[in-house]
Design a protein with these regions (language model features):
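Metal-dependent catalytic neighborhoods of phosphoester/phosphodiester hydrolases
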Residues: 22-31
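Divalent metal-coordination and catalytic microenvironments
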Residues: 15, 36, 56, 96, ...
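Pre-active-site segment of Zn-dependent metallo-hydrolases
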Residues: 1-11
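Histidine/acidic-residue-rich catalytic or RNA/ligand-binding cores of hydrolases
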Residues: 169-178
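Metallo-beta-lactamase
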Residues: 9-19, 46-95, 101-170
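C-terminal regulatory/interaction regions
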Residues: 186-237
Length: 237
């Protein structure tokens, strides 16, 4: 309805997590000429989403169907598979792992807007920037590198999926670096209950009640600790 009858030429996915890509197959049923851009590591899981659904179900449990509905496969012939480093028309593509091993970001040349997906963090209204860290691919070192990579574009604005566009690009990049260090260290040194309590407390300290509620709905704290726990477990052997 928001498109007001306009038909998109493509869906440019930053990554295939279900809150970003779960409805892609269903959307294509309405737009038969629309193509999908996706990183090569994510493409197989759009064609056959069974592992994607299973992974998300481990996080959301009995709420999976209520939250996300049916995840419809994407026909392979509708995909444009990316590796990073491409320039496609007005768009520059970079591989930006850290949040996900199949994450890419896009720079739109004419507008100088960078579409950074979850690499730019979660920022709602005047609230803080929090790194979204669900399992299984969190890699803090790669994430820091990806933040620097998209910051190096010199974009005028970052478009962050959760939620909005922001023109304080340098400050946002710095907030992400600080957030990755702070919350990564907390997850290393504490347990899930303490981590979740601190996330909620941070939101309440720095955001108004409406912003806090929006954040808790968009990025439930129970989804954040497991990704960092897995990261530290793998790193520490």
């Amino acid at each position: 309805e928001a498109l007001d009858g306009r038909v998109p030429a493509r869906i440019q996915l930053t990554h295939i997590h279900i809150d970003h890509a779960g409805a892609t197959g269903r959307q294509l049923e309405h737009w038969p000429d629309c193509e999908v851009w996706v990183h090569e590591r994510g493409a197989p899981h759009l064609i056959d989403p069974s592992r994607l659904v299973a992974s998300a179900t481990r996080i959301y449990g009995d709420d999976m169907q209520r939250l996300w509905g049916e995840v419809v496969p994407v026909p392979e012939e509708r995909l444009t598979v990316l590796t990073g480093g491409e320039t496609l028309g007005d768009w520059r593509v970079e591989y930006t792992p850290g949040h996900a091993s199949h994450h890419v970001s896009y720079l739109h040349g004419p507008s100088r807007i960078a579409f950074v997906g979850d690499v730019g963090g979660v920022r709602i209204g005047g609230g803080p920037t929090i790194p979204p860290t669900p399992p299984p691919d969190i890699d803090l070192e790669l994430w820091h590198e990806s933040v620097d990579r998209v910051a190096g574009w010199g974009a005028e604005r970052w478009a962050i999926t959760h939620f909005g566009t922001f023109d304080d690009v340098d400050a946002q990049a710095q907030a992400m670096h600080e957030g990755l260090k702070r919350w990564g260290a907390l997850a290393r040194d504490t347990d899930a209950e303490t981590y979740e309590r601190e996330i909620v407390a941070e939101m309440r300290r720095t955001g108004d009640p409406e912003t806090t509620e929006a954040f808790l709905q968009a990025m439930p704290p129970f989804t954040l600790y497991p990704g960092l726990e897995r990261y530290w477990s793998k790193r520490n052997g």
